[in-house]
């Protein structure tokens, strides 16, 4: 089966660089499956889980808080704001992050659209982290 090259990079380090049969990324418009030969595009990512597939099975799962992905017919490059393997996330840590994000939202000036959007993105990413930690 043809494969696509996948690279996942966070500000701290390159987390992953290898070939996969398929990768599913949490695009802002919804989950997006990337197979070899995919149409070129750049997509905005929302908080969620990236799933890597080999032989029809999920082999790895990584949490991302957001970022961008560049897709070409040969490769998918993810530039993540924050990223880490799902196995390294504890439910307690994720729930604390969600509580902190909700507390920060409560203090935001509701007339400041930019701050409100940022607070909502933090809550969405924290909810995605909680969901990832539970699976």
Curated annotation (Swiss-Prot):
Q: How does it assemble?
A: F-type ATPases have 2 components, CF(1) - the catalytic core - and CF(0) - the membrane proton channel. CF(1) has five subunits: alpha(3), beta(3), gamma(1), delta(1), epsilon(1). CF(0) has three main subunits: a, b and c.
PANTHER family tied to this protein: ATP SYNTHASE DELTA/EPSILON CHAIN, ATP SYNTHASE EPSILON CHAIN, CHLOROPLASTIC
Looking up CDD domains in the UniProt record yields:
F1-ATPase_delta (cd12152)
Q: Provide the protein's localization.
A: Cell inner membrane
User: Could you tell me which InterPro entries the record lists for this protein?
Assistant: ATP_synth_F1_dsu/esu (IPR001469), ATP_synth_F1_dsu/esu_N (IPR020546), ATPsynth_dsu/esu_N (IPR036771)
Q: What HAMAP family does its record include? A: ATP_synth_epsil_bac (MF_00530)
Q: Cite the GO molecular-function annotations of the record.
A: ATP binding; proton-transporting ATP synthase activity, rotational mechanism
State the source organism's domain of life: Bacteria
Keyword presence, Cell inner membrane: yes
What does this gene product do?
Answer: Produces ATP from ADP in the presence of a proton gradient across the membrane.
Q: Which organism is this protein's natural source?
A: Granulibacter bethesdensis (strain ATCC BAA-1260 / CGDNIH1)
Which UniProt keywords are given for this protein, alphabetically ordered? ATP synthesis, Cell inner membrane, Cell membrane, CF(1), Hydrogen ion transport, Ion transport, Membrane, Transport
Q: Give the family from UniProt.
A: Belongs to the ATPase epsilon chain family.
The annotated topology with respect to the bilayer is: Peripheral membrane protein
Q: Which GO terms describe its cellular component?
A: plasma membrane; proton-transporting ATP synthase complex
Protein name, per record: ATP synthase epsilon chain
